[in-house]
């Protein structure tokens, strides 16, 4: 929005306020006439008519009306509307200059022997480690839950109902997948050929023994559908999916008690660095509110943006991270639920993808020596456990960390929705920056206090981010969340 547009809107807002208050003044005058005693009616009517005419004619009184409490209220409301119009939501266009437009997302089927993510099933970035076999007399048997979803066919060859038993997380993902199958192929239902196994018919380290794995197919046994079935399983939220055989798909999930699930938000490591506008690199643990760091705008171009708050900051917490290694040598370390910018060359568009769903041969945006963000191939995906989490939020909603472009958001798959969800915090930061007293106080503090003291004051999850995380389970569909 340019300055001329802002000036035009502001002029219209001022004129509207004056008109509304003049009308209110006229209505109040007429009300007083109706309430006056009979003996004074005629004289008061004449006087009030003269006053009304004066209001319409005298610009000094018009200016006075604009400063009445009601006029100030209207002016404040219109100012807020003007600010809202000035907000820009996040787009996903091509990186650099003019490299395409965002299109609808298409789902691509998996190929035979492909796994998502491309990690060992037992790594923390996938379904996680084995916890132990569950028998009917095991204390953990009570943690298994039956699945009576009528949209799912359970083969149950044993006749004991064992195939209906599974972990809570597995049941949740399986139910989500069943809806996707019916939407994709009307009249076809999801077929579960194996779930919890008590007869030890699988390998020694199978997650079937814990109720954390299912073997699935479609009810029509059409093998041409299985590649897309595997993709739908990935979209449903299974933590590890394998197109293991032409006859079926294998899926598994993390343990219900995994601490990896409890940490729902997304962060970077404290040792990761951001590039300041001055050209210096700064560890995220030392980053402060007000620092201008390298980010990405809605056109996929490199820009500098202010840090307005920290979504989370805890330098002592142990956490599992995903590491994305690129062919340029850049390595990004981030929590699995964090959104990463992934370039889709076949569609010439950018997608925001959860870090644990980025695969080898995908392209991410890397800040290179030319000063621009360019696509580079991911050559390896690994996992690591480290201490400390830091999640800065910039005004753009993106940040370049260790030379790799990433979102500031996590947990939900929509970058635009997450960016709008934080609009109140951006507005609050803007209003605070306009306050002279606040600016003078900040200037005085800068002379006597290290700049990173702002960041040092916070330890833990920001109250607003925490509120959004709690609300998301009630207002967002499961397919939009990283669960």
From Swiss-Prot:
InterPro entries: Hedgehog, Hedgehog_Hint, Hedgehog_sig/DD-Pept_Zn-bd_sf, Hedgehog_Signaling, Hedgehog_signalling_dom, Hint_dom_C, Hint_dom_N, Hint_dom_sf. A lipid is attached at residue 266 (Cholesterol glycine ester). The record marks 312 as: Involved in cholesterol transfer. One of its GO terms (cellular component) is nucleus. Residues 28-57 are annotated as: Disordered. Residues 20-92 form a propeptide. Interacts with shf. Residues 1-19 form the signal peptide. This is Protein hedgehog. Its main location: nucleus. Residues 41-50 have a biased composition (Low complexity). PANTHER family: HEDGEHOG, PROTEIN HEDGEHOG. One of its GO terms (molecular function) is patched binding. It comes from Drosophila virilis (Fruit fly). A lipid is attached at residue 93 (N-palmitoyl cysteine). The record marks 266-267 as: Cleavage. The record marks 335 as: Involved in auto-cleavage. Its EC number is 3.1.-.-. SUPFAM superfamilies: Hedgehog/DD-peptidase, Hedgehog/intein (Hint) domain.
């Amino acid at each position: 929005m340019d300055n001329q547009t802002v000036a035009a809107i502001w002029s219209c807002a001022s004129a509207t306020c004056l008109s509304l208050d003049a009308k209110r003044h006229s209505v109040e005058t007429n009300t007083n006439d109706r309430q006056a005693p009979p003996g004074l009616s005629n004289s008061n009517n004449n006087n009030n008519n003269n006053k009304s005419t004066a209001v319409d004619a005298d610009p000094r009184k018009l200016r006075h009306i604009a400063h009445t409490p009601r006029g100030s209220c209207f002016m404040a409301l219109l100012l807020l509307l003007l600010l809202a119009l000035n907000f820009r939501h996040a787009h996903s266009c091509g990186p650099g200059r003019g490299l395409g437009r965002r299109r609808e997302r298409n789902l691509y089927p998996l190929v035979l022997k492909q796994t998502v993510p491309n990690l060992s099933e037992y790594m923390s970035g996938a379904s996680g480690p084995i916890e132990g076999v569950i028998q009917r007399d095991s204390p953990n048997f009570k943690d298994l839950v039956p699945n009576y979803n009528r949209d799912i066919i359970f083969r149950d060859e044993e006749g004991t109902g064992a195939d209906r038993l599974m972990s809570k997380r597995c049941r949740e993902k399986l139910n989500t997948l069943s809806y996707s199958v019916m939407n994709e192929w009307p009249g076809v239902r999801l077929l579960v050929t194996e779930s919890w196994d008590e007869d030890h018919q699988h390998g020694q380290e199978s997650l079937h023994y814990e109720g954390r794995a299912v073997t699935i197919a479609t009810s029509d046994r059409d093998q041409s559908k299985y590649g897309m079935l595997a993709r739908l399983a990935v979209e449903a939220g299974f933590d590890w999916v394998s197109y293991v055989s032409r006859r079926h798909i294998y899926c598994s999930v993390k343990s219900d008690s995994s601490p990896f699930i409890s940490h729902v938000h997304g962060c970077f490591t404290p040792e990761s660095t951001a590039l300041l506008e001055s050209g210096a690199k700064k560890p995220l643990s030392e980053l402060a509110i007000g620092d201008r760091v390298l980010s990405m705008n809605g056109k996929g171009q490199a820009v500098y943006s202010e840090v307005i708050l920290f979504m989370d900051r805890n330098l002592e917490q142990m956490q599992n991270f995903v590491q994305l290694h690129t062919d340029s040598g850049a390595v990004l370390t981030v929590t699995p639920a964090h959104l990463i910018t992934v370039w889709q060359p076949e569609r010439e568009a950018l997608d925001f993808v959860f870090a644990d769903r980025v695969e080898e041969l995908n392209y991410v945006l890397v800040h290179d020596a030319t000063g621009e963000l360019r696509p580079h191939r991911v050559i390896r995906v690994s996992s690591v456990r480290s201490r400390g989490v830091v999640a800065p939020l910039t005004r753009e909603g993106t940040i370049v960390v260790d030379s790799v472009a990433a979102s500031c958001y996590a947990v939900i798959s929509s970058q635009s929705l997450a960016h709008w969800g934080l609009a109140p915090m951006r507005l609050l930061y803007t209003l605070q920056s306009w306050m002279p007293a606040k600016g003078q106080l900040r200037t005085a503090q800068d002379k006597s206090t290290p700049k990173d003291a702002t960041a040092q004051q916070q330890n833990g999850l920001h109250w607003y981010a925490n509120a959004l995380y709690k609300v998301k389970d009630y207002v967002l569909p499961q397919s939009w969340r990283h669960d």
